[in-house]
Curated annotation (Swiss-Prot):
Keywords: DNA-binding, Repressor, Transcription, Transcription regulation. This is Transcriptional regulator VspR. It comes from the Bacteria. Induction: Expression is repressed by the TCP island-encoded sRNA TarB. Represses the transcription of several genes encoded within the Vibrio 7th pandemic island-1 (VSP-1), including dncV, VC_0176, VC_0178 and VC_0180. The keyword Translocase does not apply. One of its GO terms (molecular function) is DNA binding. The keyword Transcription regulation applies. One of its GO terms (biological process) is negative regulation of DNA-templated transcription.
Length: 187
């Protein structure tokens, strides 16, 4: 009577359905990538199949012959006599976190730069107002517009920072930010 044993779905497809025998780790990795039919990282695929090979050797299901890159792995009689069944495949639920969110970091940095410029503009308007009090009526409008722009930019920076924290799994701590734009008063 044959023993029934569950093995990983990938190894089942590779060793039983595709009847791979006398393979190297690289060959098994390449076949693994083909059956996964996805853009899996070759290094990760290598690690996964190598761990499986070691597990199968430990159970006496595979033997290795040779050394280094020339090492080849063969199915043992024990494995061939084994009634293997595939484990149910894990369904990979990939939240779209694999997307490249570096654009968000770039946008945040751009807004930070713009905020610094606007804050410098506000400082200059205040300085001009002190040096040339007769310009105050004209500077007030410019100062108010710069304050509004700085508040808008600060909101964008904070929003992007919070989103990036959520994506990286950090806890968002709401802080009160004070900027030069919010601290100065009309003189």
């Amino acid at each position: 009577m044959r023993r029934s044993m569950k093995i990983s779905a990938e190894m089942y497809k590779l060793l039983i359905e595709r009847t791979l025998d006398g393979f190297s780790v690289i060959e098994l990795r390449d076949e693994f990538i083909v059956i996964k039919d996805s853009l899996i990282d070759p290094d990760e695929a290598y690690k996964k199949v190598y761990r499986q090979i070691l597990r199968f050797i430990k159970k006496g299901w595979l033997n290795g012959e040779g050394s280094g890159r020339q090492k080849r792995y063969f199915q043992t009689d024990t494995f061939k006599a084994l009634h293997a069944e595939p484990k149910s495949e894990n369904v990979d639920i990939e939240i779209v976190l694999n997307q490249d969110y570096s654009v968000l970091v770039s946008e945040r940095n751009q807004y930070k730069g713009e905020l610094e410029i606007v804050l410098g503009e506000i400082d200059e308007y205040q300085s001009l107002n002190i040096r040339f009090p007769e310009l105050e009526p004209k500077l007030i409008t410019l100062l108010d517009e710069a304050k509004e722009r700085s508040a808008c930019l600060l909101g964008k920076v904070n929003g992007l920072t919070n989103v990036l924290k959520v994506l990286s799994g950090q806890k968002i701590v709401h802080q009160k930010f004070k900027t030069k734009a919010l601290l100065f008063e009309r003189t």
